């Protein structure tokens, strides 16, 4: 398996800064070129990158017995996933405010690889990375080389991995959130296909309206607006924009419509508007990424045949041979949460893997 088949998202190497000694340990600023940042991440302040979308994070190589991460969280509901030396992913819950998170301890001299991914959605909190701390005698090694292949997944809470860790109690325990981006179908596909992976997703949002029926007119952002951001927020003062030139996907998988259809029995969608807006969104993706293959699907939750038809009509309206529709299987969660759970996310990846391999020649 390729060295970085376990990872996802994009990398941005930044100018190296000399590390500063702190007592017996070594502190390294986040703009050190040996720290590779992952995902649609906000680097407005290169020394304090911010993680909004799930799956954003960092990867680095080191020698030394211990590694810590200095960070701050806007809430006490954010969580990270930490992977050391391609081992089992570990859950790290965060508290609100500044903190030092031990990523690894008791390691042999190495070398080692450490990966950190934002586990939870943006609305659960934004995480700012401040610095890396290595134990005495430790050092960072040359930056990792990421896979050349790149995948972008655009969607809602399912794309984010909400429900992956559904538990038998049918509740979300504060110490163990049910969201897990690392085991989402998109991130899993990235590992299978040896590709960097971006997740641009937000729970409860759709193409034109969210699960409450709200859209831009009510100050609520949906996918066509979220795609432009690295920190998505309905509050204009809290947003950060994304520069499309920083990363170009080979393929884009769009899974939208579940939340648009949430109020279908009360406030039916206009088929004409939904189809036209969807086609316009697909064309806007094409304009930003001329070489990407774009796959659309209706998602794993809604079984209404109208949604499937609307998506197909939108694809046809683009008249683009490299924009296609693939049917979604229904994955109903575990009985107490409608979101697909971990085994079902694996099945979703199973469904899409042969399609992506075929259209991309991978």
Language model region names:
Residues 185-196, 284-293, 315-320:
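A structural motif corresponding to the C-terminal end of an alpha-helix
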Residues 299-362:
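Catalytic His-Asp segment of secreted/periplasmic serine-dependent ester chemistry enzymes
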Residues 274, 278, 345:
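Aromatic/hydrophobic pocket-lining residues that form the small-molecule binding cavity
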Residues 53-55, 97, 119-126, 169-268, ...:
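Conserved SGNH/GDSL esterase-like catalytic core that processes O-acyl groups on lipids
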Residues 253-257, 282-287, 293-296, 305:
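Conserved, well-ordered alpha-helix/loop/beta-strand core segments that scaffold catalytic motifs
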Residues 150-154, 159, 197-201, 250-255, ...:
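Structural recognition of the beta-strand scaffold that forms the well-ordered cores
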Residues 278-282, 311-312:
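Generic structural signal for well-ordered alpha-helices
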Residues 3, 8-154, 158-181:
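N-terminal secretory targeting modules
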């Amino acid at each position: 398996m390729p060295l970085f088949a376990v990872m996802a998202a994009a990398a941005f190497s930044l100018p190296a800064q000399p590390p500063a000694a702190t007592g017996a340990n070594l502190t390294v600023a986040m703009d050190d070129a040996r720290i590779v940042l992952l995902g649609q991440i906000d680097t407005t302040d290169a020394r304090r990158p911010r993680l909004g979308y799930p799956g954003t994070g960092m990867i680095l190589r080191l020698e030394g017995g211990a590694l810590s991460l200095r960070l701050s969280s806007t809430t006490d509901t954010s969580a990270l996933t930490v992977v050391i030396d391609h081992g089992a992913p570990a859950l790290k819950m965060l508290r609100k405010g500044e903190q030092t998170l031990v990523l690894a301890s008791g390691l042999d001299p190495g070398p080692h690889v450490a990966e950190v991914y934002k586990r939870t959605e943006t609305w659960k909190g934004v995480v700012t990375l401040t610095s890396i701390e290595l134990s005495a005698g430790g050092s960072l090694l040359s930056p990792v080389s990421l896979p050349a292949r790149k995948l972008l997944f655009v969607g809602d809470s399912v794309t984010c991995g909400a429900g992956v860790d559904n538990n038998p109690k049918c509740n979300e325990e504060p110490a163990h959130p049910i969201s897990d981006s690392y085991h989402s179908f998109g991130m899993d596909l990235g590992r299978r296909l040896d590709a960097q992976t971006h997740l641009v997703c937000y729970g409860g949002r759709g193409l034109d309206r969210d699960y409450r029926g709200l859209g831009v007119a009510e100050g609520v952002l949906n996918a066509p607006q979220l795609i432009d951001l690295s920190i998505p927020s309905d509050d204009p003062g809290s947003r950060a924009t994304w520069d499309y030139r920083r990363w170009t996907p080979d393929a884009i998988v769009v899974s939208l419509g579940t939340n648009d259809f949430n109020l279908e029995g009360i406030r039916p969608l206009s088929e004409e508007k939904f189809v036209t807006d969807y086609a316009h969104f697909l064309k806007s993706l094409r304009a930003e990424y001329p070489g990407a293959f774009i796959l659309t699907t209706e998602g794993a939750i809604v079984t209404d045949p109208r949604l499937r038809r609307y998506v197909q009509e939108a694809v046809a309206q683009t008249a683009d041979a490299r924009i296609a529709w693939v049917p979604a299987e229904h994955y109903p969660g575990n009985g107490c949460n409608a979101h697909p759970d971990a085994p079902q996310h694996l099945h979703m990846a199973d469904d899409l893997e042969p399609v992506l391999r075929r259209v991309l020649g991978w």
